[in-house]
Regions:
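Feature responds to low-complexity, polar/acidic, surface-exposed segments characteristic
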Residues: 25-69, 75-104, 111-132, 140-164, ...
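Extracytoplasmic soluble-region selector
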Residues: 1-30
């Protein structure tokens, strides 16, 4: 709208009347782009480098599931503050090739007691990481004091290995569950 008004202001006991004129805006609104559901979201790599750098072919693939090796790289880069120098850390898992691009990241997080493998001694770097595993890695990387299990989510039981990690992150509003009260600890 437009018009004129007077604003009465009192400063240090002195009252002033200040005339204010509101004019019709001539600014052109900036249109909000519409995104088709079939289009992949655009990731601004300026804000994600060096933590998430995409694939060798230049793609980012934000809708893909994250592998255990990829998460190790992201968390290690965040923790270290930059990319790790080659040869500084080496993963000890028999299924992580010494020349694999993610080897040094897994080795770094192993060294910092952030990552562990499976009971059979493997790491399975190409497996999709689960929500429970991500919760454990984040809680360990942040060195959070874990809260005890109290049944926040209906599908996280007292027997789930990641229960305290999940509930700690939920308590800190870092993770959340689904509308039906579940968390999906074994889902990607």
């Amino acid at each position: 709208g437009k018009g004129t008004a007077t604003v009465k202001v009192k400063v240090n006991g002195v009252v002033k009347n200040i005339p204010v004129t509101v004019k019709e805006s001539t600014a052109t609104p900036t249109p909000v782009p519409t995104v088709k559901p079939t289009e992949a979201p655009v990731i601004n790599t300026e804000y994600t480098k060096p933590y998430a750098s995409g694939y060798d072919d230049g793609s980012f693939l934000p809708n893909n599931n994250i592998t255990r090796g990829e998460l190790a790289a992201m968390i290690a880069r965040l923790s270290y503050g930059d990319d790790l120098p080659d040869g500084m850390y080496q993963a000890s898992f028999p299924d992580v090739d010494s020349d694999a691009w993610f080897n040094k990241y897994i080795g770094y997080l192993e060294d910092k007691d952030v990552l562990s493998g499976y009971e059979d001694g493997t790491f399975r770097p190409m497996d999709t990481i689960t929500r429970g595993e991500i919760s454990a890695v984040i809680a360990r990387a942040q060195r959070y004091d874990l809260i005890s299990y109290n049944g926040i989510f209906t599908d996280v039981t007292e027997n789930d290995w990641a229960k305290d990690y999940i509930e700690t992150l939920a308590d800190k509003n870092i993770v959340s569950g689904y509308e039906d009260g579940t968390f999906g600890p074994y889902s990607p």
